[in-house]
Amino acid sequence: MSLLTEVETYVLSIVPSGPLKAEIAQRLEDVFAGKNTDLEALMEWLKTRPILSPLTKGILGFVFTLTVPSERGLQRRRFVQNALNGNGDPNNMDKAVKLYRKLKREITFHGAKEVALSYSAGALASCMGLIYNRMGTVTTEVAFGLVCATCEQIADSQHRSHRQMVTTTNPLIRHENRMVLASTTAKAMEQMAGSSEQAAEAMEVASQARQMVQAMRTIGTHPSSSAGLKDDLLENLQAYQKRMGVQMQRFK
């Protein structure tokens, strides 16, 4: 796996699923391929994106700044600086300085990532802030190692929290989660269907599913009534794709 592929993988792992994730993935691909060279416009676009947490925006801003060639005097962005200040905790800053000194001795991406993984996400973000604010310099490869270690820490905690929700025995939470998943699947179906004639059927199924979820929420239904909703939708989507000549076995 190439270095940039690895960086893209780690960074996207902390971005919530949805149309915005696809957009960010495209931007990262363009940046890494050298197709997008306007850092100013890129940062302005990133700053105004909804849904993303300040830290995620900070990490993406850091990656864009590392990758896109820019004039030396280009102003650092406040939204990135604020996100990478380790919550203003002096403890994080102390650890960040220690980590920075260790990173200075590293020359490889994997070496830097290994060193960084033993620190908390707050200290890692502060260390990124040091480099972003030009208080310290490391090679791009080492900086990417730091980015990936930070994303791994964040993705780990997100995964734990997600697993807790998926394995919860509370029927109300499970019910709501199934309805949310069915709703987002329906939305994705509508987007994929496009405007072809054969799409009418898929659109109809998606629309009915969304109306059903809306009705279930309005009148309040038994928690088990949502079981299988998303799977039914995905089966419909696969059947539609088969007719369109598209075979995607790994949807579930």
From Swiss-Prot:
Membrane topology category: Peripheral membrane protein
Entry keyword Acyltransferase: no
Any one Gene Ontology BP term: viral budding from plasma membrane
Compartments reported by the entry: Virion membrane; Host nucleus
GO cellular component, one term: virion membrane
Motif (Nuclear localization signal): 101-105
Domain of life, source organism: Viruses
UniProt cross-references to InterPro entries, sorted A to Z: Flu_matrix_M1, Flu_matrix_M1_C, Flu_matrix_M1_N, Flu_matrix_M1_N_sub1, Flu_matrix_M1_N_sub2, INFV_M1
Keyword terms of this UniProt record: Host nucleus, Membrane, RNA-binding, Viral matrix protein, Virion
Residues covered by region (RNP-binding): 165-252
Role: Plays critical roles in virus replication, from virus entry and uncoating to assembly and budding of the virus particle. M1 binding to ribonucleocapsids (RNPs) in nucleus seems to inhibit viral transcription. Interaction of viral NEP with M1-RNP is thought to promote nuclear export of the complex, which is targeted to the virion assembly site at the apical plasma membrane in polarized epithelial cells. Interactions with NA and HA may bring M1, a non-raft-associated protein, into lipid rafts. Forms a continuous shell on the inner side of the lipid bilayer in virion, where it binds the RNP.
Known partners and oligomeric status: Homodimer and homomultimer. Interacts with NEP. Binds ribonucleocapsid by both interacting with genomic RNA and NP protein. May interact with HA and NA. Cannot bind NP without genomic RNA.
Family recorded in the similarity comment: Belongs to the influenza viruses Matrix protein M1 family.
Anything else known: Most abundant protein in virion. When expressed alone can form virus-like particles in transfected cells.
Identification of the protein by name: Matrix protein 1
